């Protein structure tokens, strides 16, 4: 029972295609996307970036489990909203400390690019790590609720 996570760092934007291709190399017939609003954001974003580089890989056409939709179906009547951090707090008692809000992540990365200081990347890495841990917990809880466990 462990989570293995790989995060790719592009030291500059010229490495974007290499990062995307490294991501695709990890996908195989046993892969699935598990996201939170990834159906509307992450997967289309990745697909658009690949398309920009002339790569129309079919590797993104794998099963996709967007937990936002399950969360809305299961908990929207019990919670004030179905934001990831609301569910973390209300369903799991987790409250992120010192987390960088997702909308600021591009600014943190751009600061890294312009200043060459890796400091702004640390909160991004921690944010991503917490997202992954939360999604694994959500998946387990959703599975239990759907199956009556």
Task: Please annotate each region the language model reported.
Residues 3-90:
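Conserved DEDDh/DEDDy metal-dependent 3′-5′ exonuclease domain
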Residues 84-148:
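Acidic, Mg2+-coordinating catalytic module of metal-dependent nucleases/exonucleases
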